[in-house]
């Protein structure tokens, strides 16, 4: 066993409160709470966002939203016409509310971005100017480091850049990144080697190989992303913008044909009235909130300590149809514990325990450590260390061999998956035993994990027995998988366990399918097979061997505790390193898509009421029959037009909290979800304007000269 690692973990356990493995939230925080909490409409946040809302009046910024750009142009036109007639209070009032419509839209986006900027400020405080000490003893500013440089970091040093530990082990304070106050272990080799620039070494000494250029570190990328500087419109967002622009062009052409009709009917349509009609008919509600919805979706992930590298990844999460979930840490608690030693006939428990402990001395996994501890506690075997075995050759575990062990003192000991160990024994002229097969089947059928232990010595190669590792399925997982099934999402458990063990745990947890004895190649093949069937796939990973699959998956969530290669390959990073959070990520993605669809439905539906308000007001005097369309009984043409414009602006402000918070998400099928949204937001979009415009008309009609 690596004594340095054990020493650090023992020291940490005495100074930090114990936590269950993979808690859903960092210590001291509630689940779902990120580094920076922010209310939807805190007064300070609104005040800070107002200057940004005015700055966004720049036509170059407004042009990114075709619908709101038309409203901006309309506001300028109505203001220009009102200037020519200073006494026209109707024109000035319309102009004022059109400007408010634009400002409300900008304010929604500014508030959404403001939450990200608050998080960026927190991250900036984590960035400090550092002086790096190279391995050769020379010093250089942190900004002068290049990829491949080796730097030495000791207790109290701030790590100058992103990299991998190539020598040593240390505890590191990553609270500036994750919000987690408890230090973490970073060591060379394995999947805990990645370190982040701006974090602080608390103890001992490590040598770090720099893997990123200055300005491209993890913190730099986080700042750019949460501030929105690197945010690009997603394909769905672009498609919706094209649809909204097309509707705007159609209504623009329709309004352009009205003046000739008015002239033919012997009446005149004022430009201010035409602009008001156009603004009320085009889908301003969703046009105003579309950008804020996308920004808020990424913000909800950040609040849960998940960093999405692009909005495309968040959308893909909402469309995922297959979830690949690692068993350990995601479905089970993660730390399997050795429960018993089951020797074959002719072998004593003490002999099996001795061999199992010996083969586990170099095994730094919780399972390996538990074998060493069980042998010590149950059979009185003293805890040995690697250094005691002079000339020993330690065989590390790999995903291909699926076993580990040691060659020392004239014998070879192996421990690992049953199939791999039996194959190793047979290659050396030995054979498996019926006792071992029976024990493997019994343990697997009970949902445990059997590890076979074998030895080759002067008596030949033979199986000694089985180590029983117990797995515990996390509470509530079956209910979560039932929810995913109702949403039409297929779940697949990925495990290196044998098929019997995998099936027992899959049945207990309630997943749809499982992939047993999985290698990285098997995982990649499964992803490609699912994608070939037109499905979007999401998965988690933390090791370098996960990198190809993370890059291939539509949603690849890398653990922050993982390797640099894994974090580079994924399109999301979970700062809490909680694999179970993948299910939450999918729910947030679906909530984003549902919110966008619901508000689009509402926006298009409420145009109907505005039509019944304005068209009769324009032509009822010339065509009395149109007065029948005035089903709201609006008091006058001017009042009808003004009421529609006021409602059009206020509804944006009313819906901003919904756009930022998201429509309430309930796990259900796509058909039921569609019917519900059409009922709530389609019908609501029809009814709300009739009520709102009528109430505003009652107030407006009291204004002299309009009512």
UniProtKB/Swiss-Prot annotation:
<comment type="function">
    <text>Part of the high-affinity ATP-driven potassium transport (or Kdp) system, which catalyzes the hydrolysis of ATP coupled with the electrogenic transport of potassium into the cytoplasm. This subunit is responsible for energy coupling to the transport system and for the release of the potassium ions to the cytoplasm.</text>
</comment>
<dbReference type="GO" id="GO:0031004">
    <property type="term" value="C:potassium ion-transporting ATPase complex"/>
</dbReference>
<dbReference type="InterPro" id="IPR008250">
    <property type="entry name" value="ATPase_P-typ_transduc_dom_A_sf"/>
</dbReference>
<feature type="transmembrane region" description="Helical">
    <location>
        <begin position="640"/>
        <end position="660"/>
    </location>
</feature>
<protein>
    <recommendedName>
        <fullName>Potassium-transporting ATPase ATP-binding subunit</fullName>
        <ecNumber>7.2.2.6</ecNumber>
    </recommendedName>
</protein>
<comment type="subunit">
    <text>The system is composed of three essential subunits: KdpA, KdpB and KdpC.</text>
</comment>
<dbReference type="GO" id="GO:0016887">
    <property type="term" value="F:ATP hydrolysis activity"/>
</dbReference>
<keyword id="KW-1133">Transmembrane helix</keyword>
<feature type="binding site">
    <location>
        <position position="542"/>
    </location>
    <ligand>
        <name>Mg(2+)</name>
    </ligand>
</feature>
<dbReference type="InterPro" id="IPR044492">
    <property type="entry name" value="P_typ_ATPase_HD_dom"/>
</dbReference>
<feature type="transmembrane region" description="Helical">
    <location>
        <begin position="89"/>
        <end position="109"/>
    </location>
</feature>
<feature type="compositionally biased region" description="Basic and acidic residues">
    <location>
        <begin position="1"/>
        <end position="11"/>
    </location>
</feature>
<keyword id="KW-0813">Transport</keyword>
<feature type="transmembrane region" description="Helical">
    <location>
        <begin position="271"/>
        <end position="291"/>
    </location>
</feature>
<keyword id="KW-0406">Ion transport</keyword>
<dbReference type="GO" id="GO:1903103">
    <property type="term" value="C:potassium:proton antiporter complex"/>
</dbReference>
<feature type="transmembrane region" description="Helical">
    <location>
        <begin position="683"/>
        <end position="703"/>
    </location>
</feature>
<feature type="active site" description="4-aspartylphosphate intermediate">
    <location>
        <position position="326"/>
    </location>
</feature>
<feature type="transmembrane region" description="Helical">
    <location>
        <begin position="238"/>
        <end position="258"/>
    </location>
</feature>
<dbReference type="Pfam" id="PF00122">
    <property type="entry name" value="E1-E2_ATPase"/>
</dbReference>
<keyword id="KW-0067">ATP-binding</keyword>
<dbReference type="GO" id="GO:0071805">
    <property type="term" value="P:potassium ion transmembrane transport"/>
</dbReference>
<dbReference type="GO" id="GO:0005524">
    <property type="term" value="F:ATP binding"/>
</dbReference>
<dbReference type="InterPro" id="IPR006391">
    <property type="entry name" value="P-type_ATPase_bsu_IA"/>
</dbReference>
<dbReference type="InterPro" id="IPR001757">
    <property type="entry name" value="P_typ_ATPase"/>
</dbReference>
<keyword id="KW-0547">Nucleotide-binding</keyword>
<dbReference type="InterPro" id="IPR023298">
    <property type="entry name" value="ATPase_P-typ_TM_dom_sf"/>
</dbReference>
<feature type="binding site">
    <location>
        <begin position="397"/>
        <end position="404"/>
    </location>
    <ligand>
        <name>ATP</name>
    </ligand>
</feature>
<keyword id="KW-0812">Transmembrane</keyword>
<keyword id="KW-0633">Potassium transport</keyword>
<keyword id="KW-0479">Metal-binding</keyword>
<feature type="transmembrane region" description="Helical">
    <location>
        <begin position="612"/>
        <end position="632"/>
    </location>
</feature>
<keyword id="KW-0460">Magnesium</keyword>
<dbReference type="GO" id="GO:0008556">
    <property type="term" value="F:P-type potassium transmembrane transporter activity"/>
</dbReference>
<keyword id="KW-0630">Potassium</keyword>
<feature type="binding site">
    <location>
        <position position="415"/>
    </location>
    <ligand>
        <name>ATP</name>
    </ligand>
</feature>
<feature type="binding site">
    <location>
        <position position="367"/>
    </location>
    <ligand>
        <name>ATP</name>
    </ligand>
</feature>
<keyword id="KW-1003">Cell membrane</keyword>
<feature type="transmembrane region" description="Helical">
    <location>
        <begin position="61"/>
        <end position="81"/>
    </location>
</feature>
<keyword id="KW-0597">Phosphoprotein</keyword>
<dbReference type="GO" id="GO:0000287">
    <property type="term" value="F:magnesium ion binding"/>
</dbReference>
<comment type="similarity">
    <text>Belongs to the cation transport ATPase (P-type) (TC 3.A.3) family. Type IA subfamily.</text>
</comment>
């Amino acid at each position: 066993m690596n004594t340095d690692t054990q020493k650090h973990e023992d020291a940490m356990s005495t100074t930090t409160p114990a936590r269950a493995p993979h808690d859903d939230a960092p210590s001291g925080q509630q689940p779902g709470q990120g580094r920076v909490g922010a209310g939807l409409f805190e007064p300070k946040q609104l005040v800070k966002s107002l200057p940004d809302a005015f700055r966004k009046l720049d036509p170059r910024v407004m042009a990114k939203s075709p619908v709101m750009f038309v409203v901006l142009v309309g506001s300028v036109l109505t203001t220009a016409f009102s200037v020519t007639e200073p006494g026209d209070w109707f024109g000035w009032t319309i102009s004022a509310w059109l400007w408010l419509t634009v400002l409300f839209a900008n304010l929604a986006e500014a508030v959404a971005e403001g939450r990200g900027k608050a998080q960026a400020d927190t991250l900036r405080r984590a960035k400090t100017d550092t002086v790096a000490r190279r391995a050769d003893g020379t010093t250089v500013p942190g900004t002068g480091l290049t990829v491949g440089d080796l730097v030495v970091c000791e207790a109290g040093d701030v790590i100058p850049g992103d990299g991998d530990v190539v020598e040593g082990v240390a505890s590191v304070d990553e609270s500036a990144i994750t919000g987690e106050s408890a230090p973490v272990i970073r060591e060379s080799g394995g999947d805990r080697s990645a370190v982040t620039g701006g974090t602080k070494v608390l103890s001992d000494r490590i040598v770090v190989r720099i893997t990123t250029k200055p300005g491209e570190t993890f913190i730099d990328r986080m700042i750019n992303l949460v501030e929105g500087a690197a945010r690009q419109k997603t394909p769905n967002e672009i498609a919706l913008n094209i649809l909204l622009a097309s509707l705007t062009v159609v209504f623009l052409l329709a309004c352009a044909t009205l003046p000739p009709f008015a002239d033919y009917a012997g009446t005149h349509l004022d430009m201010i009235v035409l602009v008001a009609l156009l603004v009320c008919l085009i889908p301003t509600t969703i046009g105003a909130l579309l950008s804020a919805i996308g920004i808020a979706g990424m913000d909800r992930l950040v609040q849960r300590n998940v960093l999405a590298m692009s909005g495309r990844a968040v959308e893909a999460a909402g469309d995922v149809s297959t979830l690949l979930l690692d068993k350990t840490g995601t479905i089970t608690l993660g730390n399997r514990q050795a429960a018993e030693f089951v020797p074959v006939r002719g072998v004593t428990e003490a002999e099996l325990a001795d061999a199992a402990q010996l083969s586990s001395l170099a095994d730094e996994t919780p399972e390996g450590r538990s074998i060493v501890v069980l042998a010590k506690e149950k059979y009185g075997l003293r805890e040995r260390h690697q250094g005691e075995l002079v000339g020993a050759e330690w065989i590390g575990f790999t995903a291909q061999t699926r076993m580990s062990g040691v060659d020392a003192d004239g014998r070879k000991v192996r421990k690992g998956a049953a199939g791999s160990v039996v194959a190793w024994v047979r290659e050396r002229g030995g054979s498996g035993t019926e006792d071992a097969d029976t024990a493997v089947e019994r343990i697997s059928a009970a949902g445990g994990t059997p590890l076979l232990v074998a030895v080759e010595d002067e008596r030949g190669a033979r199986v000694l027995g089985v180590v029983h590792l117990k797995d515990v399925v996390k509470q509530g997982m079956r209910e979560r998988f039932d929810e995913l099934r109702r949403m039409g999402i297929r779940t697949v458990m990925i495990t290196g366990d044998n098929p019997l063990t995998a099936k027992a745990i899959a049945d207990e947890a309630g997943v749809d399918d499982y992939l047993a004895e999985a290698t990285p190649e098997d995982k990649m093949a499964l992803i490609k097979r699912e994608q070939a069937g037109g499905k979007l796939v999401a998965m988690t990973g933390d090791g370098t061997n996960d990198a190809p699959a993370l890059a291939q998956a539509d949603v690849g969530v890398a653990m922050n505790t993982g390797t640099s290669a894994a974090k580079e390959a994924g399109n999301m990073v979970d700062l809490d390193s909680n694999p179970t959070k993948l299910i939450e990520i999918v729910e947030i993605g679906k909530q984003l898509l549902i919110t966008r669809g619901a508000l689009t439905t509402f926006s298009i539906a409420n145009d109907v009421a505005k039509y019944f308000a304005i068209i009769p007001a324009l032509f009822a005097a010339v065509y009395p029959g149109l007065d029948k369309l005035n089903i709201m009984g609006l008091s006058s043409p001017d009042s009808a037009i003004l009421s529609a414009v006021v409602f059009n602006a206020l509804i944006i402000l009313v819906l901003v909290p919904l756009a930022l918070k998201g429509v309430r998400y309930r796990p259900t099928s796509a058909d039921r979800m569609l019917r519900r949204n059409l009922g709530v937001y389609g019908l609501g979009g029809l009814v709300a304007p009739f009520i709102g415009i009528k109430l505003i008309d009652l107030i407006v009609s009291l204004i002299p000269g309009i009512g």
